[in-house]
Amino acid sequence: MATHWLLLVYRIPREPTAGRVFVWRKLKQLGAIALQDAVWVLPQTPRTQEQFQWLAAEITELKGEAVLWQADQLYATDSDALRRQFMEPIEIEYRAILSDLKKKNRDLSALSKRYQETAARDFFASELGRQTRDKLLAAGGG
């Protein structure tokens, strides 16, 4: 299955630094991955496209420039490498949730919230995510 990608290319003034930090934090929150210094990628979905469009508008408000591209990966020595870059941190987060779910003093509400935040960045529907959801529901935290 071919994945279509969105690329956000931007330039933002160095000063004040708060704008640069805001954009970086937002990109991390969205689950975007940096391909180069100011080239970030997300799998294309209606939601991610809207999120990148909003961020591009915010970059413009910060006196920066932003261009949003739609792209297909035509060649790579390892065609699944980019997909794995998205999946690896997500699966680490799911494993941590599953580990915390086994603890006696677990906070199901907090674990459920962590699951929801992780699932929002799980662009490729990880099997571990499904298992985590099922175990949370069985524990009464879903």
Cite the ranges covered by each PLM segment:
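C-terminal, charge/polar-rich interaction regions
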Residues: 109-142
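Positively charged, polar, low-complexity stretches
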Residues: 1-103, 116, 120, 135-139
